[in-house]
Structure formats: C-alpha cells, structure tokens
Regions:
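Beta-rich accessory regions
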Residues: 202-218, 224-234, 261-273, 290, ...
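Short beta-strands within extracellular/lumenal beta-sheet-rich domains
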Residues: 74-103, 112-113, 142-146, 198-209, ...
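Extracellular carbohydrate recognition and processing domains
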Residues: 121-169, 200, 218, 223, ...
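Surface loop/turn signatures of beta-propeller and other carbohydrate-active proteins
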Residues: 127-139, 188, 195-197, 236-254, ...
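Extracellular carbohydrate recognition
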Residues: 165-181, 275-282, 719-721
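Hydrophobic core segments of beta-strands in well-ordered, beta-rich domains
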Residues: 104-105, 159-161, 217, 269-270, ...
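Extended extracellular/luminal ectodomain segments enriched in beta-structured repeat modules
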Residues: 85-87, 95-103, 154-157, 208-216, ...
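Extracellular carbohydrate-recognition regions
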Residues: 27-56, 183-193, 295, 597, ...
C-alpha cells in the first residue's frame, strides 16, 4: 500500500473539519490504496495542471463553498479553490489494475466530461464518473462509486480528475481511491438543508425605508449562505448570495449594497437569514466598521485592496480625463468566490485609490424590470476602454462614453456603457455582441485600421484553448478574424517599442498565467516570432490586465495577488502597478515589468544604507533593526566566493544563487558579476523584482501583519560584496498627507 507525499499550498485553504472528517478507515485486507489525499502534498507522481486543484489536497470545505461532507480523514481533492471559475486536471501516475473494482468517493458537479474522474487505458477514457449536481441547490456530499474493471485486469491505467467547467457546480470532489475485490456500499446522504449552503433558516421578508446611500448588513466568515433579493417597487435591484451569521455573536464584519438612487423610497428585502440577523439590516450613509477602515491588521498599505469581501481578477482598466479607473471581480458579501459583481475605484496616480459604487451586478435573470447594471447571470472578467470617436453612438454630452466588455455567463460577451464618467452604467440592450464558448474579452482600439478589436479566450476542437480575435467598427457587430492557440482565460494584447525606440515596435500577447509571446499584429491576426512563451511573472500572480487609453503611452499592468488574507473583512488583493517595456537581451527581445515611478512618492526620506560592504566568513552579514512593516529595499550584490546571497526581512527571505544564477526560483543572469534586485514589503505580502524587471515574484509573507524587526544581507558559503543596500520605509497610500 503506497501512500505517497504531497506539494505545499501556501495558506490558500480554509482548514475545516467535521464529524465526517474522522480518521480514515483502514483499507480492507487485500485492497490496494491508490490515493487517500491525507498528506501535505499530492501523492508522488500526480501531475497538476491549471489552477482549480491548487498545489495540495484540500482540508475540507474551501472559502465560499457549501459545507463539504462524506470524505474520509482530513484531506480530499476539491477543485473549488477560487470558486467554480478556475479549471484544471489532476493526473495519477500509471498503475496496474490488479483487483475487480476501483472504489472511490466522489461529489461536486455532475457535468459529463467536464467535472469527472476518468480511467484511461492506452490514453483512452474507458470509464468515467461525475458528481451528482448540475442545478442550483444540491449538496457537497461525497458518496461511494465503483468501477467494474475485471475485464481490464493486468492492464496499465491512469486516473485523471477533471475540472473543465466554470459555471454553476463547476468543480469536482474526490477521495479514498482504492482497488478492491469488493464493491463499496453507498452511504445514506444527509437530509437536505432548507436553505442553500446548509442554511436552515427560512426566507424572511421586510420593508426598509431608504434614507442613506447603502443597505448595510452583517457577515460571518463561517456563516450560513443564503440568498438576498432587493426590490424597489417592481424593479429588481440586487440578487446575491450572502454569508449570513447564524446569530449576533457570530458577526465578523459588516458589508453594504449601493442604494443611493432610491433614497426616499421603500425597498422590499428578502433574505434566507436568522430573524435576529434580518432585524439588523438597515439603510445608512455609513458603512459599519469593526476595525479601523484601511488600517486593519492585515490590510495592504500600498497595494490596492477592496473595502469589503472577496476579489479576484482585475477588470475594466482604463484612463479617462485625468482619472484611472480600476474594476475587479468582486463578492460583496463573503470572503470566498461568489456573486461576481464588479468593484470600481478611481485614482489620479494609480497609487491612491478611492472606491466608487460597484459598476456591474450579477443575477438579473430573465427579469425585464431589473437594475440597468444587472447582467443575466455572473459578470465574469472583461476590460474597459473609452469610445473617443463615438463609434457606438452612445455619447450624450461632452463626456466621452466609457465602455466595459465582459462575459455575462447567462448570455455571452456583453457590453455596458457610461456617459457620465463612470458614475452610472447601463447594460447594453443588444447583448450579447459575441456568442461562443469562451470568456474574458479584452477590448482594444486598433488605430491603424480605425476599428475595435476583442481578444477573448475561446475553446474549440480545431484550435483547443486559444485566444480568438474579433473586429468591429461600432462595438455592436463583430466578425471573427483569427485564433492564437495555446492560451487560457483573461487575454491581453498590446504594442510596445523595443528599447524605447518608437520606430521599432512589437506586439505582446498573453493570458491569465502571464506567459507571453512577442510578434506582429495587423489588426486581425497575431503572428508570434518565436516558439513557446516567455515569462516575467512568478508566484501568486494571475489574470493581469493593462490600462487602456493611457495618457502618457505607458503600458501599465496590475495582477490579481492570489494571497489568502485570513480573518479580515476582505480577502485577496492586487499587485503594484508595473510599467511594461521590451528590451533586447542576449536571449533576444524580452518583456520587463518594473513598479511604476509613482510608488517612490511613498518612500520616507533618509533610507538606511550600506555601500561597498565586504561580507566574509568572519563578518557574514549586514543587518538593520527596523520598525513597522512597509519597506522598499534595493540591493546590488557583487559575486565573490559565496554560493548564495540572502536578504532576510522578518520571517521571509529572497535568495540569489550565484552558481545557478537564480533569484529564488526565477532565472536571473548576472551582469558584469553583479546582480540587482528589489523587494516591496507590505503587511500581508511582498514582491520581488530582479534585474530591473526581468523577473517579478508575488508572494504572501510568512509573518503577515507582524513587525519586520530586522532586515539583513548574508553571504552563505564564502564572501561577496554588497555594492549597495538601500532600505526605504514606506508610507501608507490610504493615509492622505
């Protein structure tokens, strides 16, 4: 019986146990255990693809998920990491079929070929099983399934656990896979709860007089998920799932929904929540804070993060008339993936952000009289731009029309527009403008051809996963032009000068993982000039996007920092904005990502410094005692005999390997025997930038929220020279001077 080890997942999982998660039952004599997922990493030889399965087994229920039960022990495969949107595969090493049956526990989505476990022999699927759920409601209960494999005895086989679905029940749960000569007996399923997500509460309805900008209500980090709907008159205004506390003692934080346009009217609010919780709902001009806003213990201080709830992908990024507009995938009413509203913030400099009313709302369904911001279903990712030439004909006054392109999961690729500088948004009545199997459109104006371009993830038999290119003259009618194979989710495409020469430009294309290709684009077709993809970004980085219509020609990128921030009224955050450039290197033209210069305005004066400092066996370190947690550290090291140079900041570290020429896991070549890197340290996270932007890593801190204490540079295995070390303390972007 082979129980093999597992790969580390940095704190993205909620560690919850239950009566069903009792110690694993020992396999019956003669059984062959293939995997029980009890270790800290996936079993040896199991291959992970995509993002849905993370890097290690789940420990029960994940953030934003209904209660998971029926698995054995403490671990299981659970692809709800980040919600139903992420996809991926988990493939076992090859094994020999030696018993009559393969038995396993399975639950989650019931989409054939999409959320399933397959048995492959000679590369072909011979048996498959799915979870039981395809419709809203359902249960996250795992039950036994048996495959009769007697006719395959002696053959080599592979197991493949698949999550290739992104809508409702777009995930799969699997546990305790064994070979046996006996079939496992199904367990009685738990009684269905009266509310979604194990919520036993009835629906409660009440009327609330709208006297302020918001309806505010309490949330619990381990609450009972229930549906809330808000009508004003006959109009559907909000319809979302909320993590309600079971009682007053379980309140962790308060959130809000925008209601300013209805002041003076009465809203009918229906919620599946405890009566004592429903009584706390109120209209208010103020959001209730149980911790100081933007100064919570783990709040990033110079990285954008939303006031309340979960965030994932950056969306809609554009500039108009002196303001940067930043949007994002947002769950206003919980710390896990759900609901997919679009948050919205504005900034004059991409550093100091002010949150605005949320721009888009999900789950309008087929209700004709719904709020103008509401989509049919989820508002998945997309982009933004400014219709400077009024090609769509929506402009009403002197202000240009701002346009959002996004995926409405109940409709297709859709548009919303604003004629008042982003204050209000209208869902285009002609949606969808593109109907296909993909999502996450990037909207771009192609000036040489005087037409719009949408680059969007697609998937078909001919091209597999790809970026599809569409064009339009008026934003409303679109033609498909070409496909770029080998990309998944959140497409981005833009033009950059090489070595800052405006007469020598190339185009860059990438998708959610930020691995990019360089080539040529004629407005309809992208042609790469090399095989494969290149890489700048590493670590907990995903789904980045660049600002459209920039005022100074820069291409500035922001990514989703996939960092779990525990026990806060918000979860996840974003990277610092980075300026993208193309440079000629000894390996060819490569893209660099450098933090924008505007961040340097947050540096406090009088940095701690060291120059031309020799580190030897007798004096192997230079060390500074520091206060606070916010730092910008810039290092230049000169090679000596040391194997490594290590920068430590609190419990975290960045290591340069002189022999391997790597900065942590990132390849980074020295120049003239020297290497330069920079670390931006914030309360829950840090970013490591090597070689002036040749590589860029995003990571959570090991000691989130704790004072750094000391910053040190150490030579390991010999000597080196600290050519320069500068440690700047940083100011908070939330605190106005």
């Amino acid at each position: 019986m082979n129980r093999t080890p597992f790969a580390l997942l940095p704190c993205l999982l909620l560690s919850l146990t239950s009566p069903e998660s009792a110690p694993a039952v020992a396999a019956e004599a003669g059984d062959i255990l293939l995997a029980d997922f009890e270790g800290k990493t996936y079993p040896e030889g199991w291959k992970v693809e995509g993002t849905a399965f993370g890097k290690a087994p789940a420990r029960g229920t994940l953030g934003g998920q209904m209660h998971v039960s029926g698995f054995e022990g403490k671990g299981l495969v659970n692809s709800f990491l980040g919600g139903d949107k992420p996809t991926g595969k988990l493939t076992s090493p090859e094994f020999t079929i030696e018993r009559d049956y393969i038995t396993f526990l399975i639950g989650g989505g019931g989409h054939k070929g999409k959320t399933c476990m397959n048995l492959l022999i000679d590369g072909k699927v011979v048996l498959t099983a799915t979870g039981p759920n395809t419709q809203p409601g359902g249960s996250e209960f795992l039950n036994w399934e048996n495959w009769d494999v007697r006719k395959y005895k002696g053959k080599k086989a592979v197991l493949q656990i698949v999550d290739d679905a992104s809508g409702g029940w777009g995930h799969i749960n699997v546990d305790q896979i064994s070979q046996s000569n006996k079939q496992a007996k199904k367990k009685p399923a738990p009684a269905p709860a009266r509310g979604r997500g194990g919520n036993p509460q009835p629906q409660n309805a009440q009327e609330i007089k709208i006297t302020g900008k918001y309806i505010i209500f309490p949330v619990s980090n381990r609450g009972q998920r229930g549906r809330m709907t808000i009508y004003v008159g006959e109009q559907l205004v909000h319809n979302l799932d909320c993590d309600f506390p079971p009682n007053k003692d379980a309140i962790d934080w308060w959130t809000y929904l925008d209601m300013a346009e209805y002041v003076g009217k009465t809203a009918k609010v229906t919620a599946r929540a405890a009566p004592e919780i429903c009584k706390l709902f109120e209209s208010s001009d103020k959001i209730r804070h149980l911790q100081p806003l933007y100064d919570e213990a783990l709040r990033p201080q110079f990285h954008m993060s939303q006031m309340r709830g979960w965030n994932n992908d950056p969306n809609g990024m554009c500039h108009y008339d002196g303001e940067y507009h930043f949007f994002w995938q947002c769950n206003p009413a919980g710390r896990g993936w759900a609901n997919m509203y679009w948050g919205h913030a504005t900034s004059p400099d991409m550093v100091r952000w002010t949150e605005q009313d949320r721009a888009l709302r999900s789950f309008g369904g087929n209700v004709k009289n719904r709020h103008p911001k509401m989509a049919v279903r989820n508002c998945f990712s997309g982009s933004g731009n400014v219709d400077l030439n009024n090609t769509a004909g929506w402009q009403k006054g002197k202000d240009k029309t701002m346009v959002l392109a996004f995926t409405d999961t109940g409709c297709g690729e859709s548009l919303a527009y604003s004629t008042d500088r982003g204050k209000t948004w209208t869902y285009y009545e002609g949606n969808p403008v593109i109907r296909h199997s993909g999502r996450d459109p990037k909207l771009m104006w192609y000036k040489p051809g005087e037409h719009w371009v949408i680059a969007v993830f697609d998937q078909d038999r001919e091209h597999g996963r790809n970026i599809a290119i569409y064009t339009s003259k008026d934003l409303k009618k679109w033609e498909r032009q070409s496909n770029v194979p080998g990309y998944f989710e959140c497409a981005e495409i833009f033009e950059l000068p090489v070595d800052r020469d405006p007469k020598k430009t190339k185009w860059v294309i990438y998708a959610a993982d930020a691995r990019y290709a360089i080539g040529h684009f004629d407005g309809k077709k992208f042609t790469p000039e090399h095989k494969g993809k290149h890489r700048v970004h590493w670590g907990q980085y995903y789904a980045s996007q660049c600002f459209s219509n920039p005022p100074d020609g820069r291409v500035v990128q922001i990514g989703w920092a996939r960092i779990n921030i525990p026990d806060m009224p918000f979860n996840q955050t974003f990277t610092v904005p980075t300026n993208l450039t193309l440079h000629t290197t000894e390996d060819g033209v490569r893209m660099f990502a450098t933090p924008i210069k505007e961040l340097e305005a947050l540096r406090k004066p009088s940095p701690k410094t060291a120059e031309n400092k020799q580190l030897t066996a007798e004096a192997p370190a230079v060390q500074f005692d520091v206060k606070d947690q916010l730092f910008d550290i810039v290092v230049t090291l000169k090679k000596g005999t040391a194997a490594k140079g290590v920068l430590r900041f609190g419990s975290s570290a960045a290591t340069y390997d002189f022999a391997g020429q790597k900065l942590d896991e990132m390849p980074l070549k020295m120049k003239d025997g020297q290497v330069t890197f920079r670390v931006l340290v914030d309360r829950p996270m840090y970013e490591l930038i090597g070689g002036g932007g040749a590589c860029f890593k995003t990571s959570g801190r090991r000691d989130m929220g704790k004072p750094i204490g000391t910053i040190s540079l150490t030579a390991e295995g010999g000597s080196l020279t600290v050519e320069s070390l500068k440690v700047y303390q940083m100011k908070s972007a939330w605190k106005r001077d």
